[in-house]
């Protein structure tokens, strides 16, 4: 008996088998809806900022000349 999961978009049951071309989605439509949500940044992966804007003040750098070559 194959594992059954719900489509993340429409909640339809999807069998988790090699023949399920769009798993975990039930169809290409739901797969594309999810892709569009990622592209429009409705979904994001939270990350810690690598750069702290307040660090400029600590180093007494001129912000206007920072990116000039």
Curated annotation (Swiss-Prot):
Alphabetical list of InterPro entries matching this protein: DNA_gyrase_inhibitor_YacG, Znf_NHR/GATA
Pfam families listed in its UniProt record: YacG (PF03884)
The UniProt record lists the keyword Zinc: yes
Keywords: Metal-binding, Zinc
GO annotation (BP), single: regulation of DNA-templated transcription
HAMAP family: DNA_gyrase_inhibitor_YacG
Superkingdom classification of source: Bacteria
Family per similarity comment: Belongs to the DNA gyrase inhibitor YacG family.
Disulfide feature: none
Assembly notes: Interacts with GyrB.
Task performed by this protein: Inhibits all the catalytic activities of DNA gyrase by preventing its interaction with DNA. Acts by binding directly to the C-terminal domain of GyrB, which probably disrupts DNA binding by the gyrase.
Entry's cofactor comment: Binds 1 zinc ion.
A GO term for molecular function: DNA topoisomerase type II (double strand cut, ATP-hydrolyzing) inhibitor activity
Keyword Ribonucleoprotein annotated: no
Binding-site residues for Zn(2+), renumbered to this chain: 7, 10, 26, 30
Gene: yacG
Name the UniProt record assigns to this protein: DNA gyrase inhibitor YacG
Cofactor: Zn(2+)
UniProt organism field: Shewanella baltica (strain OS223)
């Amino acid at each position: 008996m194959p594992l059954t999961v719900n489509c993340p978009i429409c909640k339809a049951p999807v069998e988790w088998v090699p023949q399920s071309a769009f798993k975990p989605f039930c169809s290409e439509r739901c797969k594309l809806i999810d892709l569009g949500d990622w592209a429009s940044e409705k979904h994001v992966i939270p990350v810690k900022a690598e750069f702290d804007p307040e660090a400029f003040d600590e180093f007494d750098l001129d912000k206007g000349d920072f990116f000039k070559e």
